[in-house]
Amino acid sequence: MSTDQARLLLHCRGLVQGVGLRPLVHGLARRLDLAGTLDNIPGAVRLDLQGARPALEQLLRLLPELLVPPARLDGLEIRWCPPRCPSPRGLHIGAAATTALGPGLVTTALAPDLAPCGQCRAELADPKDRRHRYPFISCRRCGPRLSIAVAEPWMRSHTTLAAFPLCDACRREFNDPLDRRFHAETIGCSACGPRLQLLAADGRALAQGDESCLAAAVALLRQGGILALQAVGGFQLLVPAADGHAVERLRRRKRRPHRPFAVLVDDPGRLAALVALPPGALAALHDPAAPIVLLPRQADPGDPRAAEVAPPVAAGSPWQGVMLPASPLQLLLARDCGCALVATSGNPSGEPLCIDPAEARRRLALVADGFLFHDRPIARPLDDSVVQLVDGNPVLLRRARGHAPAPLRLPQPPAADRGLLALGGDLKAAPALLLQGTVWLAPHRGDLISAAVERGLAEGLQALLDRWGPGLQGLVCDSHPAAIGGRLADELAASHHLPLRRVPHHHAHAWAVAAEHGAAGPLLAWAADGLGYADGDGDDHRLRGCELLLLQRGQPVRRLACLRPLPLPGGDRAAVEPRRCALGLLHEAQLLDHPGAQACLGAFSPGALPLLLAALDQGLQAPLASSLGRLWDGFAAVLGLLHCQTHEGQAALLLESLAAGPAAAAVVLPSLTLPLRPARSCGQPPRLDWQPLLRRLLDLRQNERVPMAPLALWLHRSLVVSLVRGARWAARRHGCRQVILSGGCFQNALLLDGCRRGLAALGLEPLWSQQIPANDGGLALGQLWAVLQSA
């Protein structure tokens, strides 16, 4: 090998901090006899190496091949420089240029939090290992990252572990290039790391020392108590999943009467009697992100293990959310309890996640019976991520811990000179930042109807603008005039002197999927959800929830078809009272006198019904909405499944549960295609008319006595056929082949799977959300893309 000296300066961008990149390069550079510095800097890793040029070129070739996930190189800036004289000696790992994160919503290079790796799990269980049962075991391949970061770049002094100096034994591992904890910033042991504390709800100490605290916490759980656990990105509430009374008590105290709970298990072997494990399930569960994975319930009454999860846990859902431990502390608790545990977010419903022990004791005092704390502070709230499986591949429904703040991998990255900040929606808020050709989607923040969530989001957005404002050319938000996010956007745009663009809700849903797949267009897109606002375009309604769009770069989005609008008596109240949606359907279709309508009409008080009907007759307080979500709510109420709901999508979930169950096949009903009828007014798009479907539903239920489960499946199949045929009609007219399926309604597995298969059978290519949520959690990406594609 040539001895001529050369110097190579590399800037590595992507997921490069907290993933062992510098130790990897250190080992490679040692083998190649190179010298220099390996530094974390804000947003990148900077390598300044000197040695023989062939050796440096070999490092360039090998580096991308040797990276181990989740490490990821999205960009590599290479510069050859004159060699230093005298030549540097040795290799030095360090960091430079501190940037405080504050409440910032994204970081540009830091890995997400990672669940315990296999080696750490083995050490945790090994009585001979010095970290046996240490609740905070980690290495450079796993452990907390974003949840403890207070500044960039990644180094121990920039985390909430700064107050825990390493003992001599840990320091030796940290400095040993041959040790897997070489420069692992999160390591520690029982001699130098964080400690546990267990308190009763009244503040009394229940135990002292890690082992005593764990034992007492397990005893509390086994007695049916509710434990508030300081987990990775915030507090969790735990109860034994088999204890139906404890689960119901948790529901009352948390004010979450019906939304399904997820369960935590220490080992997938416990799942065989509880859920189906389709292809991809185990891989999704073992992902280092440790998400909640939605799996089909299949409790076998004959298997005693089926009793490990009481019926109130899933609350009638066809799916059971399951997760493996995201931290060694969770693993110890689950293993010591020896049973499945309900694991839900540590907050009263609708409020932000608790992250501070004092805050948790105050806000959860009437919820939890005990509090298991530790003294490693949480820097920012991070909910659990949620995925479902489509064809064996994970599809994100909530992008949070374990996935954020990793930059999105887009097939067609935007131009490096564009800088935009999009706020997303008021529900499932998750802003997105576009900078230097990369998009970062912030972790799920919750719903802005909570004043505390709104304050937290405003602080995070302000931190983003303070840091990256000079590189931005504008802000983007939803076009709804009453949106909370829109008000925030107005204030921020004015204070930072930035232009503001507003994007219609469904345009953003559709463009988000186009961005994820790198689809250039022309594209068709079904956008279907609860409600989204649209700007005035000459139509008779602006509240929409099911429309077929034509997308093409540089052209305005065209609306090709939509669902026939239905009146919503009481406006927003219809979203929480499916009986109002049903009343609007029956009134619009002139079916109030049908015998099958009486079950729904009887859900109203004698005094309320005449007032609502009078309002419908006069068109007062009954806005029109072409909403698939509200249509589904109305059908559920017509069938008598649910008249008032306590959480978003509850009625639709009950319909899906019936349709997915074994009883649905008891009666086979031919699908009914919704006719695509011309609109009443010139210039308006044709409408899928739901009235024949409603009339037939009433007849089947009242006259033919068809059970509810086959009816629910029939409704799903009829809608699938109608959406697929609508796409075929538009594809022939406009020469399109790709069809986007976007919006929260396509979280319904039956709808998504049916539409995917139906479109593919016609030679069309379906596109759907995978690495970003189909619901409003993916809106911000679509808002960015809508602006970029309009240029």
Sequence positions of predicted segments:
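Short beta-strand scaffold segments in enzyme catalytic cores
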Residues: 237, 292-294, 384-388, 429-434, ...
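A contiguous, well-structured pocket-lining segment that forms one wall/lid of small-molecule binding clefts
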Residues: 186, 193-194, 425-463, 584-736, ...
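A phosphate-binding glycine/aspartate-rich beta-alpha loop in the early core of alpha/beta enzymes
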Residues: 226, 234-299
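Intrinsically disordered, low-complexity, mixed-charge
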Residues: 1-186, 190, 194-197
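Conserved phosphate-binding catalytic cores of ATP/NTP-utilizing and phosphoryl-transfer enzymes
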Residues: 272-278, 353-360, 384-385, 405-418, ...
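Internal gly/pro-rich beta-alpha loop/helix module
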Residues: 66, 173, 336-414, 620-625
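Active-site histidine-anchored catalytic micro-motif
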Residues: 514-587, 591-596, 617-618, 622-626, ...
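Conserved phosphate-binding/catalytic loops in two-lobed NTP-binding clefts
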Residues: 478, 497-509, 737-742, 747-749, ...
